[in-house]
């Protein structure tokens, strides 16, 4: 994936898995890098913020780790979340990584 970099844009490395959400068939970004970076930071922050809540639900013993992730995904796919379906899937995948929980790799998600 070709991503032009300038001085300020090198501060935060965006994972290729997130860049792929915004890449066209020729592996070029469909949005300006600044927009993609902002969306990445939002999704990463959400995943980080959800770790405590997800861990608490899981440790309560009433729901499985997978159910917790499914609930998070459903919430983030809600139109009020401000995320696209693909971003929601990425954020939950990242949440699972942060918690060390298994989660299937997300496929292409319709918006």
What does each model-found stretch correspond to?
Residues 1-111:
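Charged, amphipathic alpha-helical regulatory modules used
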